[in-house]
Curated annotation (Swiss-Prot):
Propeptide: 21-39
Protein name, as recorded: U2-sicaritoxin-Sdo1a
GO cellular component, one term: extracellular region
Keywords: Disulfide bond, Knottin, Secreted, Signal
Domain notes: The presence of a 'disulfide through disulfide knot' structurally defines this protein as a knottin.
Lineage: Eukaryota, Metazoa, Ecdysozoa, Arthropoda, Chelicerata
Source organism of the structure: Hexophthalma dolichocephala (Afrotropical spider)
Main location: secreted
Signal peptide: 1-20
Organs and tissues of expression: Expressed by the venom gland.
Subcellular location: Secreted
Length: 74
């Protein structure tokens, strides 16, 4: 049972990426779905945040201050 489910899931993923090679917009959407680096919460005002290029982690906006980034209301 588990083996057939795993095979079925792998087939869907492979088909999706094969289809995405033809359609660049679908590839972008698949990459966003596959990424699992976004938290289930947002970082509050005044707290440090990672580089905004790595994802939108702030409740408001992540702005640079020197070499670090902070969540600010802008």
């Amino acid at each position: 049972m588990k083996l057939s489910f795993c095979f079925f899931l792998c087939a869907i993923v492979l088909f999706s990426f094969a289809e995405a090679r033809i359609n660049p917009n679908q590839l972008k959407r698949l990459r966003e779905l596959v990424r699992d680096d976004e938290p289930t919460y947002c970082i509050e005002l005044g707290e440090r945040c990672p580089n905004p290029r790595e994802g939108d982690w702030c409740c408001h906006k992540c702005v640079p201050e020197g070499k670090r980034f902070y969540c600010r209301d802008q």
